[in-house]
Design a protein with these regions (language model features):
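A short SAM/SAH-binding and catalytic strip from SAM-dependent methyltransferases
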Residues: 115-128
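A short acidic, Gly/Pro-enriched loop at the edge of an enzyme's catalytic core
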Residues: 106-116
Length: 251
């Protein structure tokens, strides 16, 4: 099958989860981000909405045996990924655990996680599901753990409920931080590059979130790839603006 002819949402394991042409990048950028945030091989990771193991195939190779956990209602996505790219040998070696519930439950593994990643989940959920999911994630998060999630930012908040895939919904930064506060979590918007969404970090303790110095290293830039040139050109524009502004106000 010619993957380039597929559209996001098509019935193929590399297309159902997003733009098939960016399947490789969207998996790799999650892996890079979590490693930058301190993910080590011994940590427990929950891939919330793991889909076709787009990033999971990288985490599986990196993490120790029994440290990768995935929740995905569409079981066929995981099965197709194992058959076509991950391989049964890696599954047997690393012994990941999967659950197929569609109720956004995270306690099904009876584990506490160092990291919970939810890429492009809250871009398809109403307020009711966000509240449920974040509450469940908090209960399954270690005291010094991190929730790493994306949202599509907008001026006007989506006012509906339920799961709206493949449609997308938007929330303002103020509303996103309110979701966190209502759950008893601290939130931080980070500048890590995403082609369509914005990355947020949530933690039980504010000290677990990156400070201003650390945030400088959370860019996620991709060099020498025209498709993702915005990942570093935007940063360059900001730097030039700051330098120009500084020369204007300083003697």
């Amino acid at each position: 099958m010619d993957i380039s002819k597929l559209k996001p949402g098509d019935n193929h394991y590399q297309a159902y989860v997003g733009p098939p042409a960016q399947y490789d990048f969207m998996g790799a950028t999650q892996f890079r981000l979590l490693c930058t945030l301190g993910l080590r091989a011994h940590h427990y990771l929950l891939d919330f909405g793991c889909g076709s193991l787009r990033s999971g195939r990288l985490f599986l190779s990196y993490l120790d045996e029994g440290r990768y956990f995935g929740i995905e209602p569409n079981k066929w996505l995981i099965e197709d990924s194992i058959s076509n790219q991950v391989g049964k040998d890696l599954i047997e070696l690393k012994k990941p655990r999967f659950d197929y519930n569609s109720d956004f439950k995270t306690d099904v593994f009876s584990e506490q996680f160092d990291f919970i990643v939810a890429q492009s989940i809250f871009s398809h959920t109403g307020r009711d599901i966000i509240a449920t999911a974040m509450r469940n994630m908090k209960e399954s998060l270690k005291p010094d753990g991190l929730i790493v999630a994306t949202f599509i930012e907008g001026i006007k908040d989506y006012d509906g409920n339920g799961w709206v895939y493949p449609d997308c919904v938007k929330y303002s930064p103020v509303t996103i931080k309110r979701f966190a506060k209502e759950t008893g979590l601290f939130a931080s918007r980070i500048p890590w590059f995403h082609p369509r969404q914005t990355w947020y970090l949530f933690g039980r303790n504010k000290s677990r979130l990156p400070n201003k110095v650390m945030r400088r290293y959370l860019a996620g830039a991709v060099l020498f790839e025209p498709e993702f040139a915005a990942s570093w050109k935007k940063s360059q524009q900001i730097i030039r603006f700051i330098k120009k502004y500084t020369t204007l106000i300083l003697p």
